[in-house]
C-alpha cells in the first residue's frame, strides 16, 4: 500500500480576509455561530448573565408546545388581559387558540399573549415558570434562569448570548416556530393584525428569524438567523443602546459570519484518486470513491488529504471492491473519508491464459536480451 499526502486549497482562501477582529459592536454581549455545526466564530462576554427581554418568549412557546396543541382554546384571565407593555389587547374571558397566542407572542412580542399561553399550558404562571427552568436545565442552558414567561425585567430573570443562541437553534427545529418567526406580518382572530419587531426580516436578505427583545434593563437585544449560499449563521446581540444600532450591528455580524464559509467538495466521485497496476497484461485499474462529500468549511483553514491505495492488485477484482481509502483532515480532526473502490471488474485468467502470458513475457525478455 502507498500513502499520498496533499494539501487541499479551499476555494477563495486568498479572496477572503483571515479571521481577524470582527465588526465593531456596541452592546453588552454578542456571539456569532454556525447554525449547522454549532461552531462559534466570534464572541464577546458570551457567558455573562444578562436580561434578555422578549427573547424569553422563545422558551415560553417551546415549553407550551410540550403541553398544549395548536388548536386548543385558552380563556384569557384578568391577569393576562391587564399586563402592560407590548400587547394585542386581549380581553378578560376572551377565548383564543394556542396558535394565535403563539403568533402574537413571537411576531408582535405580545406580553398578554405570552401570559395567557403560560396559564393555558401550565395551569398557573408560577408552575409554567418552573417548567421553563426545568427545560432550560435539560437543554444545558447553564447561564439561564426565568422569573416570568414574558421577559419583563424581574430579579432572577437572565440568560447569556451563548444560551440565547442555543435556545434559538433548538426552537427553530420546531416547524411551527420556524414558520412564524419568519413572518413580517400575520392576522389572527379578533381582526388583529400582527407586525414583527424584527427589522432584519426586511432589511437583510436571507434572514429567517428569530426573536427581538427590549426593556429598560435589557436594552435592544436580538437573536437573528440568516442563510446565504447554503450557509446558516446565528448572531445574538444583547444590550445594544438603540434599535438602529442593534440592527446595524447585527447586519455586520451576520454578514461577517456568512463570509467565513464556503461549500467545498472535499472528496469527489468524479476524480481518479489512484491507478493500480493489474497483472497478466491487463490495463491499469482506476480507483474512485462511490460517493462524494461536500461540506461547509472555513475559508481560512487548509485541509490535508491522505490517499491510501495499493500500487498493484491481485486478481480477480470486482467492480466496487474496496482497495483503499481517502481521508480529509483539518489539523488532526477527520472531516471526511470514503473508500477507494475498483471502477471495473478484472477476472483472473485461467491456467492456459496465465501460461500464455508468461510465455509471451519470456519471449519478449529473450528478444530484448538478444537485441
What are these regions (language model features)?
Residues 153-158, 162-371:
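Domain-terminus/edge residues, biased toward the C-terminal soluble/receptor-binding domains
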Amino acid at each position: 500500500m502507498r500513502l499520498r499526502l496533499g494539501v487541499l486549497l479551499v476555494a477563495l482562501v486568498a479572496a477572503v480576509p483571515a479571521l481577524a477582529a470582527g465588526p465593531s459592536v456596541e452592546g453588552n454581549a454578542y456571539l456569532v455561530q454556525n447554525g449547522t455545526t454549532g461552531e462559534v466564530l466570534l464572541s464577546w462576554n458570551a457567558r455573562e448573565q444578562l436580561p434578555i427581554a422578549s427573547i424569553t418568549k422563545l422558551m415560553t412557546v417551546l415549553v407550551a408546545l410540550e403541553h398544549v396543541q395548536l388548536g386548543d382554546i385558552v380563556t384569557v384571565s384578568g391577569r393576562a388581559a391587564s399586563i402592560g407593555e407590548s400587547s394585542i389587547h386581549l380581553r378578560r374571558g376572551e377565548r383564543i387558540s394556542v396558535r394565535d397566542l403563539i403568533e402574537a407572542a413571537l411576531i408582535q412580542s405580545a406580553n398578554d399573549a405570552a401570559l395567557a399561553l403560560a396559564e393555558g399550558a401550565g395551569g398557573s404562571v408560577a408552575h409554567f415558570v418552573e417548567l421553563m427552568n426545568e427545560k432550560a436545565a435539560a437543554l444545558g442552558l447553564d447561564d439561564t434562569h426565568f422569573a416570568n414567561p414574558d421577559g419583563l425585567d424581574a430579579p432572577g430573570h437572565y440568560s447569556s448570548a451563548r444560551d440565547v443562541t442555543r435556545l434559538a437553534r433548538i426552537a427553530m427545529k420546531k416547524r411551527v416556530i420556524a414558520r412564524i418567526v419568519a413572518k413580517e406580518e400575520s392576522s389572527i382572530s379578533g381582526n388583529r393584525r400582527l407586525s414583527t419587531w424584527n427589522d432584519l426580516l426586511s432589511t437583510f436578505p436571507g434572514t429567517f428569524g428569530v426573536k427581538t427583545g427590549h426593556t429598560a434593563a435589557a436594552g435592544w437585544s436580538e437573536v437573528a438567523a440568516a442563510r446565504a449560499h447554503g450557509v446558516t449563521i446565528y448572531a445574538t446581540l444583547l444590550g445594544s443602546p438603540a434599535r438602529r444600532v442593534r440592527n446595524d450591528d447585527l447586519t455586520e455580524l451576520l454578514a461577517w459570519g456568512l463570509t467565513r464559509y464556503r461549500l467545498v467538495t472535499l472528496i469527489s466521485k468524479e476524480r481518479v484518486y489512484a491507478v493500480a497496476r493489474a497483472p497478466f497484461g491487463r490495463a491499469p485499474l482506476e480507483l474512485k470513491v462511490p460517493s462524494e462529500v461536500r461540506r461547509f468549511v472555513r475559508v481560512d483553514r487548509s485541509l490535508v488529504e491522505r490517499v491510501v491505495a495499493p500500487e498493484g492488485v491481485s486478481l480477480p477484482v470486482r467492480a466496487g471492491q474496496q482497495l483503499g481509502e481517502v481521508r480529509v483532515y483539518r489539523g488532526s480532526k477527520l472531516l471526511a473519508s470514503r473508500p477507494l473502490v475498483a471502477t471495473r471488474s478484472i477476472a483472473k485468467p485461467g491456467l492456459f491464459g496465465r501460461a500464455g502470458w508468461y510465455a509471451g513475457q519470456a519471449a519478449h525478455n529473450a528478444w530484448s536480451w538478444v537485441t
